[in-house]
């Protein structure tokens, strides 16, 4: 196993942060906590429902971790949308994270996908069953064009996760494969399309800007995610089909060369994003910039990406990149490091326990009504 290229990673991260002029001022601390609480409470209540528990069969602990990650991503990044949309997107993207972590073979339950879709029958695949039920709650916030992007991108994501089940890097010489898979499972169009709710934007009036933003966001957000995920995925056996490692196999290049390719693509995409929209409607640019800065803050602060380990590693490194990275990290940490205990409650486990207690109390009450003499004796004994 090669050693993680710490110095190179620091230089890459610093260049990215400088390119986008990173300065997350999306919220006051109180606003951030309030939005986190609102989105989490609605999403946790959704996933604690008996139907979701029975169909998903995901452990409450894993579900809790997924919820906290996704609620953070949505609240930090979608800073310009309503709290209600934040909550609905949090539910949708939690479903996608659950699928991304799944190891179940979808083939048997997808045999009648289109037939069921055409005839209006429920889907056989449990994930599609639940996602389709929730989709109207998401789509009600958008016009038809943005809605179509969300639907299509979610379908692509499912197929991308299906492909990843095979841990296939692409055949040597198949240079198009890594980008094909990453665009498919990156949710870029879903993310790009969900920045423009009809409450804030008339999609007909801003059609060209929205279309261009979706096109640019498709690559930017997945490449930034790949850069920020590179450390956590470096030695994780579950993440061996990352974009960087697929470049290594398909193009026959070294890991450092593949990382450099990703770095250059990400930096170029960041520059394009800033240049293309800097002269457009200020409201469009503000939405994009707030998303970019919030998305980076989320990566730097969320435990899933383990970037605090990189920060800790650099404390004894006095290079320019190391010092700049520490400064950026501390800036992000100051605004984005909020303990889940401040907003993620009641937890999914607590909600499930509460529901069980209420169901037991209801059963006891029904039993007492069915057998009043026995209940009266019990009351006398208790007295």
Swiss-Prot record:
Keywords: Lyase. It comes from the Eukaryota. Pathway: Sesquiterpene biosynthesis; trichothecene biosynthesis. GO terms for molecular function: trichodiene synthase activity. SUPFAM superfamilies: Terpenoid synthases. It is an enzyme of class 4 (lyase). Belongs to the trichodiene synthase family. This is Trichodiene synthase. It comes from Stachybotrys chartarum.
